[in-house]
Amino acid sequence: MASHNASQTTKAIVAKCLASVRAHPAFDGLVSEVNGAVAVNNIVPSFSGPTEGWVGYHNKMAGYAHSANALRAVYETCVKLGVKFALGSDRGEVTRLVYASSPPSKECVGVETRRGEIYRAKRVILALGAAVGALLPQIGSQITGRCWGIVHIQLTPKEAEELRGIPVTNVLDLAFFFEPDKTTNKLKFCHMGGGFTNFAGSRDGLSLPYPRLADSDFVPLEDDTYIRRLLREALPQFAERPLIDAHLCWFADTADSDYISDYVPGTDSSLVVLSGDSGHGFKMLPILGDFVVDLLTCGSQDNSKWRWKEACMVKEPNAWRGETATQELAGIPRSRS
């Protein structure tokens, strides 16, 4: 969707997305154009705000993934299958890759953790999201660590029930949200846009997440502004409610929003990198493992889009996120909500 105040560029992006899904036979009869408040209210009667001038489309096949529950289910299944996890800041935090000592070989033979413990392996797989450059600086021309701000508002059980089952609502120039969490009754919001980088203090000229999780417990002030504007448009009764549980959500961004799933060149096929989620990769969780198995079985990446690429520094994000430019986190005003 685009709000009535959205630029023509943003509205054109939404129209392009609509044309794309309409052209795919899988969406036949499941996508409808939305133009104005009456159309919005017909789809989501629980929106009490004006939504005047909203334009876009309703895709009945769209949805969301509950990331916390999904990851918990994967973890529990892995444990049952015998996978061993080394967790915690000492046992689980990897500080460097370990390579064979005999040059000129660059064979990766394991990893070392913060407390000095070395885990050895015939093949090492790096799946570190936005932090991948900390262990593999040479990927910096392909991956930029970016983040968006995430906030929540607390609803009562009655308020949450009234919004149960609403469609994922993404107003491209404002923010997106979806139905409240069934356990906490919290409503989650994210203003996407161009995102934010953290190049400050990087020794290798890379944008990386803050080293401590607690350092990311805030959102930029502009996110607060966009989210409250969306609330006034859709759910004005919550527009002044405190924004809680604020944090930055980091992702590994590529120039084309495609993954990097390949062997790292020059490592004798001993090191594999899985990265480039680009802020939209989690929906692939149920099938991503199959792609990795194919890579390990074949010994090379057949999909050219997912190969290791040289000299393709990510500058600005793709248009599907809107037209706002990326900003550097250092020095930006922070929300106090």
What are these regions (language model features)?
Residues 1-43, 53:
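Dinucleotide-binding Rossmann-like beta1-alpha1 core, especially the glycine-rich loop
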Residues 86-109:
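A conserved short coil-to-beta-strand element within the FAD-binding core of flavoproteins
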Residues 5-12, 57-77, 215-223:
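Short beta-strand to alpha-helix junction loop
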Residues 11-18, 37, 71, 224-228, ...:
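A general structural signal for well-ordered alpha-helical segments in protein cores
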Residues 226-337:
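C-terminal catalytic lobe of FAD-dependent flavoproteins
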Residues 119-123, 128-269:
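Active-site substrate-recognition segment that forms the wall
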Residues 32-35, 84-88, 242-245:
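General small-molecule cofactor/ligand-binding pocket signal
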